Amino acid sequence: MYSLVFVILMCIPFSFQTVYDDKSVCDSDNKEYMGIEVYVEATLDEPLRQTTCESKIHKYGASVSNGGLNISVDLLNCFLNFHTVGVYTNRDTVYAKFASLDPWTTEPINSMTHDDLVKLTEECIVDIYLKCEVDKTKDFMKTNGNRLKPRDFKTVPPSNVGSMIELQSDYCVNDVTTYVKIYDECGNIKQHSIPTLRDYFTTKNGQPRKILKKKFDNC
């Protein structure tokens, strides 16, 4: 009995130390670790095609192709990278999620200086382009590549950068909703965290709750 208690007590400090070592990256005085999540919901003019999901991650951006639609995201003046791409499809709609991972779980990590962080809050642009990968001679071609006009445009507070999102859509896209979140990855560890930045764009009325609840499969 006593030996069992001794073993348990010996293991507890080791467990705490392991967690602390994993997250000690957050103790840096001259680096900030920011994460990003970008959600896209795009509804096409016709049911989705049966295609194989393909994704690519490159420096300061990523793209995913599925259902006859390619969604590409480029991060300009954000100093951030994506590490995962997820997708979900339903009838005529493609849902995509681009996200980074915590700094203690992956390399390379999204680290930046304080000067970079200031530039991010002032100049970060999330450039989203929706490109159709279906036959353009089909009768359902409507907008001929023109940019969608938003019926409802708003930022989701708190946001101190105004609109971060720039979006351009191809001819087959009927409606689109996008949501961007940039957050302090060490926010739950540090005493003072950096405020989260959020932005939201949609061509239809509503909030992005539906898009956030979808189950995304890695692509």
From Swiss-Prot:
Glycan-carrying positions: N70
Cellular component terms per the entry's GO annotation: extracellular region
The entry assigns this protein to a family as follows:
Belongs to the orthopoxvirus OPG170 family.
InterPro entries on file: Orthopox_35kDa, Pox_vCCI-like_sf
Q: Which Pfam families match?
A: Orthopox_35kD
Q: What is this protein called?
A: Protein OPG170
Q: Where is the signal peptide?
A: 1-16
**Subcellular locations according to the entry:** Secreted
Its biological purpose is as follows: May interact with several cellular chemokines to interfere with chemokine-glycosaminoglycan (GAG) interactions at the cell surface to alter chemotaxis of nearby responsive cells.
Native species of this protein? Vaccinia virus (strain Western Reserve)
What keywords sit in the KW lines?
Answer: Early protein, Glycoprotein, Host-virus interaction, Inhibition of host chemokines by virus, Secreted, Signal, Viral immunoevasion
Q: What drives induction of this protein's expression? A: Expressed in the early phase of the viral replicative cycle.
